[in-house]
Amino acid sequence: IVTGASRGFGRGTARILASEAGYKVYATARTQSALQSLQKEVAESNGAGEVISVVLDQSDDEAVAEFVRRVSASEEKIDLLVNSAYAGLIAMTPHFGKPFWERPISVFDGSMDIGVRGAYVMSALVAPAMVKAKNGLIVQISSYGGFAYVFDVGYGVAHAAMDRLSFDMATELQEHNVRAVTLHPAGGQTEVTAFPQGESPTYVGRAVMALAEKADDVYLTKANGKTLFTSELAQKFDFSEDGQTDGSLNQARVEALQPFKDISAKRLAQYDFNAPLPNPSDTNNPDFAALFPGAKNFKQ
């Protein structure tokens, strides 16, 4: 199951799992036309897998529960859940440069509802099937904003929660041989975002595929509950962006990742009495809206 599959990292993940890994992927989103085009792309790729498109509003708990019941009834097991649905980018982009008290409350809700809460609900409903099978992997798609101020209060709070969601779920799932991890891509090149040298949706999809198909039990046991980085997974499991074969882009991304890893390796600023507060204008100013040019084309 891949949520948020109409665009961005969710769409790329669904496509790679079906076309390159041969999975039967239940791809969920609210936009039927986008799901149908994804289904067509996968069918035309001549891969061994398939995409089952499911129009689903993740704010509707009963609809989500009914969807999981249908999948559980028709499939022997659910091997993988990727929680990628997130409405925060669309919600926050028109308000760059404003502090949280000048932004609509709906900006916070965009990150928390179709983001953290949606991931929690879907995971809670899928977990029983995985526990019964004594096997399964849950992946949350998150961001460096989980451990440093980036863009918006809601953005940071939501991604910190996503990181913690995997850790605490893994703690309770470990005795059942079910794993939960968080995946941190860097900035992306998607329908919404335009980060320079950003990661493509298919690159992130290959990171998920590596965890599901290439990682052995020893690695997954150690990774359980942890936050993993796409560029490091690319080096470990030998995948790359389309057209990049010499490893130079992966290496550049690993090097660019280091400052963020340094932050995450230290005691987080909120737990360090002597740590200075960041300057919000470093990442929350009107110029940053240019990194999200596609946000205006979608509704929250």
Question: Where are each of the predicted segments found?
Answer:
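Conserved glycine-rich cofactor-binding loop
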Residues: 6-8
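Conserved glycine-rich Rossmann-like NAD(P)H-binding loop of the short-chain dehydrogenase/reductase
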Residues: 20-37
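Active-site Tyr-X3-Lys motif and surrounding loop/helix of classical short-chain dehydrogenase/reductase
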Residues: 66-70, 92-102, 106-113
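Catalytic loop of short-chain dehydrogenase/reductase
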Residues: 87-88, 99-107, 137-175, 186-189, ...
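A short, exposed helix-loop element centered on a Lys and neighboring polar residues
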Residues: 123-124, 167
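C-terminal helical subdomain
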Residues: 182, 195-298
